[in-house]
A protein has these predicted regions:
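N-terminal Rossmann-like NAD(P)+-binding subdomain of aldehyde/semialdehyde dehydrogenases
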Residues: 1-105, 133
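Substrate-binding/gating loop at the entrance of the active-site cleft, primarily
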Residues: 97-113, 117-137
Length: 137
């Protein structure tokens, strides 16, 4: 499957995800946290391989630091997941309600983000941060 086909599939799934109740989205965030902890050693081993390859290719120290995913970064992302679960549902909030004219009202309501594309380099923690924010919202 290429990127265009994957994008089409995502667009088809987006309305289903957008309709998920907050309880289900929060359970998904909790499950991500659980799975990260359950697979921590596999994740760390994969990261060690990435770091080794980066070192062989003389990657800059600043990039090496960003590429590192260790116990501290795992603790950070799992704490972020917990914090995100505790936030109120961002969907369906009225942020503006204005009578423009007789019979004409302007209302701004928050809605799900939808399908996004992200390019990031050397930040394994970014995957969890970005995907969890999208899931919550």
């Amino acid at each position: 499957m290429n990127i265009r086909e994957e994008t089409k599939q995502m667009k088809l799934a987006a309305p289903l995800l957008a309709a998920m109740p907050i309880e289900q989205r929060n359970r998904a965030l909790a499950l991500i946290k659980t799975r990260l902890n359950e697979h921590r050693e596999e994740i760390f081993e994969a990261n060690r391989k990435d770091l080794s390859l980066a070192l062989e290719n003389h990657v800059a120290p600043a990039v090496m630091k960003r590429l590192t995913f260790d116990e501290a970064k795992l603790a950070d992302v799992t704490q972020e997941l917990e914090s995100l679960q505790s936030l109120p549902d961002p969907i369906g909030k009225i942020t503006l309600h204005r009578q423009l004219d007789e019979g004409l009202t302007l209302t701004r309501v928050t809605c799900p983000i939808g399908v996004i594309g992200v390019i990031f380099e050397a930040r394994p923690d970014a995957l969890v941060q970005i995907s969890s924010l999208c899931l919550k919202s």
